[in-house]
């Protein structure tokens, strides 16, 4: 039986949505489809393959994800290698050093959000950004109209297409994506900041799912005998 490529473009989008909230895995396929913009078949195939790999478990309270941290790690690695490079729109640079130093005062156009290093800084103030990731659902020209950036193929501002449809904080992308951006940088200071995000913002990525599944199947076994 041919396995579905969970960690290619459509699969990565589905897994990203599932990891956002523990209840997302319990939602109807059609609702999941609408939130991420992939086909209904892709949603079903991803969930079937995740179940086959042991990441999705059926309990008396509905489906849950187990081994969330392992699934997160797989998603982060494959997101940075497979999907993120395809999302790149282009690069820009701040017009002046003063603009760069005052980046927090920039009112990003509606439809744009900080990712990576600036998002980490806005989250806990720990990391001073060197590279400025921005995720956008509108043309890059809207950012130029702010008057503080310019086109520069070698610039420190990297624009990526947004790949989800639900509303998020209007300044930063979801914490999982901040974590992924930082982990993908390969920079030691970013890796340290990523661990802070994991510890403080992604506390629920524990092995609770395994315990719930174990409890469910233990109860089922006892009832059968």
Regions found by a protein language model. Give the residues of each.
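Short alpha-helical segments that sit at the start of domains
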Residues: 1-16
